[in-house]
Amino acid sequence: MEAFTIHTGRAVPLRRSDVDTDQIIPSEWLKRIERTGFGAGLFSEWRADEGFVLNNPAYAEASILIAGPDFGTGSSREHAVWALQDYGFRAVISPRFADIFRGNALGNGLLPVQLPAETVETLQTAAEQDPSVEITVDLAAREVRGAGLVAPFELDDFTRWRLMEGLDDVGLTLRHEELITGFEATRPAWLPSAV
C-alpha cells in the first residue's frame, strides 16, 4: 500500500449525495479480483452523460474527489475503493461516509476525509470556479488546506500511523514475520502452519 503523508492535487466537485457503491463501480465490473483496471468502470453509468463532471477535461488530472453527504453507502465493495484509486484519486472529502466504505478505504490507502458540509461546499465551489485550484490533504497535521481555508479533520492515531507507514493488514502482519516464523518453527509438524 502506498504511504500517505501529505497530498496536494486538483479536485473534482461531485455534487451528489447518497452515492452508493453500485454507482461508484457497477456490478458488471466486479468479475475480477485484481486491484487494478477498475478506473474505466468508475461512475461508468454517469460517465455516459457528456455533462458528467468527470468528462470535463479540466478535471482530467484531479486526485481529490469532493463529494456530497453519505458517500459510499450500499454494499461492502472494495472494488469501489479500487476504482477510485485506479482512476487516480488519493483522497475523498465528504460531510459523511458510510462506515463500511470508510473502513474499506482506510484499509486500502484511500483517505476519506470528513469535513463539515459548509467546508465541503466551499471546496466544491472553489473547484468549480477554478478547476486548477489545488487542495492539500495533510494527514500529518490532520488538516485540509485550500480555497482560503484550513480545515482540521479527525482520524485516530493508529489508523493515521498505518496510512503514513503504508501498512495495510498484510503489511502490518509482515512486520512480525520473524516472530511468526519463529513461532511456526516450534510447533509440531502435525499442526497446521500459518506460514
UniProtKB/Swiss-Prot annotation:
Domain of life the protein comes from: Bacteria
Gene Ontology MF terms: 3-isopropylmalate dehydratase activity
Keywords from the UniProt entry: Amino-acid biosynthesis, Branched-chain amino acid biosynthesis, Leucine biosynthesis, Lyase
Broad class of enzyme this protein falls into: lyase
One GO biological process term: L-leucine biosynthetic process
Enzyme Commission number(s) of this protein: 4.2.1.33
GO cellular component, one term: 3-isopropylmalate dehydratase complex
Reactions catalysed according to its record: (2R,3S)-3-isopropylmalate = (2S)-2-isopropylmalate
A Pfam family annotated for this UniProt entry: Aconitase_C
Keyword Amino-acid biosynthesis: yes
Pathway: Amino-acid biosynthesis; L-leucine biosynthesis; L-leucine from 3-methyl-2-oxobutanoate: step 2/4
NCBIfam families: leuD, PRK01641.1
Function: Catalyzes the isomerization between 2-isopropylmalate and 3-isopropylmalate, via the formation of 2-isopropylmaleate.
Family statement: Belongs to the LeuD family. LeuD type 1 subfamily.
Subunit details: Heterodimer of LeuC and LeuD.
Protein known as: 3-isopropylmalate dehydratase small subunit
